[in-house]
Design a protein with these regions (language model features):
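Conserved aromatic-histidine-acidic binding/catalytic patches
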Residues: 2, 33, 37, 156, ...
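Aliphatic-rich helix starts adjacent to a transmembrane/signal segment
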Residues: 1-52
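Short, glycine/small-hydrophobic-rich surface segments
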Residues: 27, 33, 41, 49-84, ...
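Surface-exposed loop/linker segments characteristic of extracytoplasmic
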Residues: 69-180, 184, 188-199
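Short linear sequence signals and composition-biased patches located at protein termini or domain-edge surfaces
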Residues: 56-59, 99, 157-279
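Short helix/strand-bridging catalytic loops that position acidic/His residues to coordinate divalent metals
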Residues: 26-31, 147-156, 247-254
Length: 279
C-alpha cells in the first residue's frame, strides 16, 4: 500500500513537472515567433524607408513620393495603473523607391482579421509592391498609388500583395526634417528646418487632435529626412483568446487590458536620398 502511494506521488510530481516544462517551452516558442516576426518586419521597413526617393513628377495628379494616413486608434490600459493609457495607432503608408531604370511603389496597410469585430485595430499587415519602367513612370506617375488604393479596398489591381504579420495592433509613423525636428501642422513658417516649398509638402491633423497625430503627403522634390515608425504585435495567446470572444464589447474590453502582451518595435530611419533644397 505504501509503495502504491509513493508511486502515485512520484507519477503526479513528474506529470506536473512535465506539464510546466511543456507550458514554458510553448511560451518560449510563441515569444520567439513574435520577436522574430517583429524583427523581420522592422528590418524590412528600415531597409526600404532609407531608399525613399523624390519622384520630381510635374503632373499634378498622383505625384506622390510619400504619404501616411491614420486609419484608427485604440487606447489600452497600462498594467498596475488605472489612469494611464497607451494609444495604439494604425496607419497606412506609401512611398517611392528608384533603382536604375525602374521605379517601385511600396505600400503597407492593415486588413482587419475576418474573425475580429470591425473598428478594432487588430489585423494582418499587408505589403503592396508595383514596379514600372522610367518611361511609364514619367507618363503615369499616379499608376502605382492608384493600384495601391485599389488593393486596399479589395478591387482588382496591378502589382503584388504579400501577407507580412498577424495580430498587429499598432502601425504608426512620424517624419522629421533635416534638422531633426518633428514635422507637424502646428509648426507654421518660418521655424528652423521647416520645409519652404509648401506646394511639395503637407501635414495635417486627423479628426483626433489629442494626442497629436499627423497625416503626411510629400510630392515633387520633397521627402522626409527621417522617418520614425512603431510596430506593435499582440502575443499569439492573447490574439487567440481575443478571436474566441464572440461579443464585440467583450472583445474590446479584453483588448483594453492587454497592453502588457503587446510587443512594440520602434525605429528611426535616415532617408539617404533627401533633397535638401526642399527644406
Amino acid at each position: 500500500m505504501v509503495v502504491v502511494v509513493l508511486m502515485s506521488v512520484v507519477i503526479l510530481g513528474l506529470t506536473a513537472m512535465f506539464t510546466q516544462t511543456q507550458r514554458a517551452f510553448k511560451a518560449g516558442m510563441t515569444q520567439t515567433d513574435i520577436l522574430e516576426g517583429g524583427r523581420m518586419a522592422t528590418e524590412m521597413l528600415s531597409r526600404e524607408l532609407e531608399q525613399i526617393v523624390p519622384g520630381y513628377a510635374t503632373l499634378n495628379l498622383g505625384r506622390t513620393n510619400f504619404y501616411t494616413v491614420q486609419e484608427s486608434e485604440f487606447p489600452m490600459n497600462l498594467p498596475a495603473n488605472s489612469v494611464a493609457q497607451r494609444t495604439n495607432i494604425v496607419s497606412r503608408i506609401f512611398y517611392l523607391t528608384h533603382e536604375n531604370q525602374t521605379w517601385t511603389g511600396i505600400g503597407y496597410y492593415l486588413v482587419p482579421d475576418s474573425t475580429v469585430a470591425p473598428g478594432l485595430p487588430v489585423g494582418v499587415l499587408n505589403r503592396f509592391e508595383l514596379s514600372v519602367s522610367a518611361a511609364t513612370f514619367g507618363q503615369q506617375p499616379s499608376l502605382m498609388i492608384f493600384n495601391f488604393n485599389r488593393a486596399m479596398v479589395g478591387l482588382s489591381y496591378q502589382g503584388t500583395v504579400s501577407r507580412i504579420l498577424d495580430g498587429v495592433v499598432s502601425f504608426n509613423f512620424r517624419t522629421y526634417d533635416t534638422n531633426g525636428y518633428w514635422i507637424n501642422p502646428s509648426r507654421a513658417t518660418p521655424p528652423l528646418g521647416q520645409i519652404t516649398n509648401h506646394s511639395d509638402w503637407s501635414a495635417n491633423f486627423p479628426i483626433t487632435l489629442y494626442p497629436p497625430r499627423v497625416n503626411y503627403h510629400f510630392v515633387g522634390s520633397a521627402v522626409p529626412a527621417y522617418v520614425e515608425f512603431e510596430l506593435g504585435i499582440l502575443e499569439q495567446g492573447a490574439l487567440d483568446h481575443y478571436k474566441s470572444i464572440p461579443v464585440w464589447l467583450s472583445q474590446s474590453n479584453y483588448l483594453w487590458q492587454q497592453s502588457s502582451r503587446v510587443q512594440v518595435f520602434r525605429q528611426r530611419v535616415s532617408v539617404r536620398n533627401v533633397d535638401r533644397s526642399a527644406y
